[in-house]
Every structure is written in structure tokens, then in C-alpha cells.
Amino acid sequence: MGMVSEFKQFAIRGNVIDLAVGVVIGAAFGKIVTALVEKIIMPPIGWAIGNVDFSRLAWVLKPAGVDATGKDIPAVAIGYGDFINTVVQFVIIAFAIFLLVKLINRVTNRKPDAPKGPSEEVLLLREIRDSLKNDTLKSG
């Protein structure tokens, strides 16, 4: 079997296609969550705290400056505001995935309905069997 035909077999399998669709949807969902956190959730929280822009929060370890030759030296800072935004994004994505997995588990783990009892055909067959037994016992 050639490599091309093996690759076709591999790529056509349902799991690979499902995985590819999941990756594309996940990437799009990540962008939606990023926009939700950065543009909708964090601005009101920042406003409530006192007009704080979380994306600009940082601990400055060394401020920006100019060296002896006049060259700009950038600041050295730990941007914890971006970290807070990322943590909020993670929590939202993790919660959404939790809900999705819970829904999938509920659908796939449904217990089949309990049998309602024997069908009419089974009852009829039982009557025939019992009748044949009785006839055999009477004649024997």
C-alpha cells in the first residue's frame, strides 16, 4: 500500500476529521472568549475598582530610561494585568468545556428504559407452549 493511500485512509477516518473540526472551533472559541474578557468583562471590573486598565497593570522592576549615548532603554516589568486577563479567559473556557463534557456524558450515558414486560408475541408463544405441555401430559 502506498504512502498516499495510507494517508488517505488515515485522514478519512472519523476521529481525525472530528479532531480537525474541534481544533478549528476551539481556536474560534478562544478568540470569542478573549474578546469577551478584554472588551466586555474586564472594563467594568476595572471601572468599578477605579478606572484600572488590567492590560496595563505591571510591576516595574526597572523603569525606562536613556543610557549615556542617548539610546532608549526599555522598562523591565512584570505584566500581571495580562496574566489576570488570561486567568479569567482560562476559567471561562474551562467552565464551558466542563458544561459541554457534562452534557455529552448525560446524552451518552442515558440508561435505556426498563422493559415494559413481555410483548404480545411472547405472551402468545408462552400460551402455546403451555398448551402443548398440557396436551402432552394428558395424552401421555
Curated annotation (Swiss-Prot):
Entry keyword set: Cell inner membrane, Cell membrane, Ion channel, Ion transport, Membrane, Transmembrane, Transmembrane helix, Transport
Keyword Flavoprotein: no
Any Pfam family: MscL
Gene3D superfamilies, per the entry: Large-conductance mechanosensitive channel, MscL, domain 1
PROSITE patterns registered for this protein in UniProt: MSCL
Cellular localisation: Cell inner membrane
Gene Ontology CC: plasma membrane
Membrane topology: Multi-pass membrane protein
HAMAP family: MscL
Quaternary context: Homopentamer.
Family: Belongs to the MscL family.
Function: Channel that opens in response to stretch forces in the membrane lipid bilayer. May participate in the regulation of osmotic pressure changes within the cell.
Protein name, as recorded: Large-conductance mechanosensitive channel
Species of provenance: Xanthomonas oryzae pv. oryzae (strain KACC10331 / KXO85)
